[in-house]
A protein has these predicted regions:
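Conserved class I S-adenosyl-L-methionine
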Residues: 2-47
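Class I SAM-dependent methyltransferase SAM/SAH-binding core
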Residues: 54-106
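A conserved beta-strand element that flanks and buttresses the S-adenosyl-L-methionine
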Residues: 118-119
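A short glycine-rich, Lys/Arg-flanked "PGG" loop and its adjoining helix->strand segment in the class I
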Residues: 132-144
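Conserved beta-strand signature within the Rossmann-like core of class I S-adenosyl-L-methionine
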Residues: 146-152
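Acceptor-substrate binding/catalytic loop of class I
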Residues: 165-183
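Conserved S-adenosyl-L-methionine
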Residues: 193-204
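Core SAM-dependent methyltransferase catalytic element
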Residues: 206-228
Length: 228
């Protein structure tokens, strides 16, 4: 029997749940979220005006919207995603940003192109080996002294990898991978980054997660690329 391509299935899921996704997140004000505000304020404080920022796994473009409309640094933001339906929403949601249909596993931008890369709730949909390849690509894309911000689900005592009915619509299935802080700390230390911040997060609303994800925490790690 042919093995299921869990990542491909997950991409198809996101194409099919865009309305449920929008309905959920439109009630979640990013600016009103204290933890988000702390993280994004730090990121903004570390960037100069006109900085080039990549949002890898942008979904409906909430982060590009915030970065292009809610601060006065005239950032140039590009959001990428594999879901065409999500990107259609993103283009309307954040008209000051640019968007491209692109897989984080096959990014085609030039090297040393970005001052910052943010990747929130996206690496949770790839396995560890793929994640490391993506991080290597991010390293190529970042300028020296560039900032990277990664947000993922944390693995404590839970099952690390799960392939479950999608919490927003159980008609579909989604692959999740949870990570330890050590996984990213080891990578960044070995690849000439300085870890600047690690934030422990709670999910927006555990009641929306389904029984397989209740109790799962998140963390955000922010690191700076050093010169080789």
């Amino acid at each position: 029997m042919m093995e299921i391509d869990k990542i491909k299935v997950t991409i198809e899921t996101y194409n099919n749940i865009v309305e449920e996704y929008v309905d959920y997140y439109k009630s979640k004000d990013l600016k009103g979220n204290v933890q988000f505000q702390k993280e994004i304020d730090y990121l903004i404080s570390q960037l100069n005006k006109n900085a080039m920022i990549l949002d890898a796994g942008t979904a409906i473009g909430d982060y590009p919207k915030f970065l292009t409309e809610k601060c006065d640094k005239n950032f140039n933001v590009i959001g990428i995603d594999t879901s065409e339906n999500m990107l259609r929403k993103a283009i309307k949601n954040a008209p000051k940003a640019k968007f491209k249909l692109m897989d984080i596993r096959n990014i085609t931008f030039d090297k040393d192109n970005f001052d910052a890369i943010i990747c929130f709730a996206t690496l949770i949909h790839v396995d560890d080996k793929t994640c490391l390849r993506v991080l290597d690509k991010f390293s190529e894309l970042l300028k020296d002294k560039g900032i990277i911000a990664i947000n993922v689900m944390e693995c404590n005592n839970e099952e690390k990898e799960i392939f479950i009915p999608e919490p927003f619509n159980p008609k579909y299935k989604t692959y999740f991978n949870r990570y330890s802080k050590q996984f990213f700390s080891d990578y960044f230390t070995a690849n000439n980054y300085t870890i600047e911040k690690i934030y422990d997060n709670k999910m927006f609303d555990e009641s929306a997660l389904g029984e397989n994800l209740v109790g799962t925490n998140e963390f955000t790690i922010i690191a700076r690329k050093s010169k080789f």
